[in-house]
Amino acid sequence: MEGRLFTFLGAIGGHGQEWIILSHYVLVIGIIFIIARAATRKLQLVPTGSQNVLEAFVGGIISMGADTMGEKNARTYMPLIGSLALVIFVSNMIGVIPGFEAPTSNINFTLSLALIVFVYYNYLGIKKNGFVAYFKHFMGPMPVLAPLMFPIEIISHLSRIVSLSFRLFGSIRGDDMFLMVLLMLVPWILPLPGFFLLTAFGVLQAFIFSILTYVYIAGSIMMEHEEH
């Protein structure tokens, strides 16, 4: 299998990389749909069960951003960041289950997520501040330093694509390799602590991606606060 983990979906449709990632992404979306459906089917004033879990998740996402950009802005951008966090979290979790592969272990998938964040926060920055003012901010506080600061800022922003995508990809890909070696070397009972560790890493990576997205958006829409 060329060093790849066995996957049930791969056994159905072949072990090509495109099929593996696409089929598991569709599975992720299906799981999220089921979760959302279960949580919103019978909404109650006092939440219970899956509604309680989903409301806690939404509240956690808002609290995460409130410290960075204030609660009002955090609520405004919660749908995007909450969606990204949920997709990344579920993707990471199905990768922990033997027989499935995390879409986030593919660089093309994580690069797509990073590009969504990059394009969106720059769009918000231009919309909020204007095209000229937004890029003028890249030149720094002193005009004499503009020829130096502008290319540095451009490179810094472009590097965020690499940072977001490769951090997530590297962590989850490493988890997959760790899981493969673990299952090859020891019986099924002994790897249980490893599964808990991989679960913790998956949650952590979803958190990091979400908080960085909040930080990047805050930096693009709150430039006037940085100047004071």
UniProtKB/Swiss-Prot annotation:
Keywords from the named record: ATP synthesis, Cell inner membrane, Cell membrane, CF(0), Hydrogen ion transport, Ion transport, Membrane, Transmembrane, Transmembrane helix, Transport
Gene Ontology terms describing biological process: proton motive force-driven plasma membrane ATP synthesis
Pfam families linked to this entry: ATP-synt_A
Superkingdom field: Bacteria
Molecular function as annotated in GO: proton-transporting ATP synthase activity, rotational mechanism
Membrane topology qualifier: Multi-pass membrane protein
Keyword Membrane: yes
Chain ranges passing through the membrane: 16-36, 45-65, 80-100, 106-126, 138-158, 178-198, 201-221
Cited InterPro entries: ATP_syn_F0_a_bact/chloroplast, ATP_synth_F0_asu, F0_ATP_A_sf
Record's keyword annotation contains Cell membrane: yes
Gene3D superfamilies: ATP synthase, F0 complex, subunit A
GO terms for cellular component: plasma membrane; proton-transporting ATP synthase complex
Compartment(s): Cell inner membrane
Role according to the record: Key component of the proton channel; it plays a direct role in the translocation of protons across the membrane.
Oligomer and partners: F-type ATPases have 2 components, CF(1) - the catalytic core - and CF(0) - the membrane proton channel. CF(1) has five subunits: alpha(3), beta(3), gamma(1), delta(1), epsilon(1). CF(0) has three main subunits: a(1), b(2) and c(9-12). The alpha and beta chains form an alternating ring which encloses part of the gamma chain. CF(1) is attached to CF(0) by a central stalk formed by the gamma and epsilon chains, while a peripheral stalk is formed by the delta and b chains.
Family statement drawn from the similarity comment of this UniProt entry: Belongs to the ATPase A chain family.
NCBIfam families registered for this protein in UniProt: ATP_synt_6_or_A (TIGR01131), PRK05815.2-3 (NF004481)
Name of the protein in question: ATP synthase subunit a
Organism in which the protein naturally occurs: Aliarcobacter butzleri (strain RM4018) (Arcobacter butzleri)
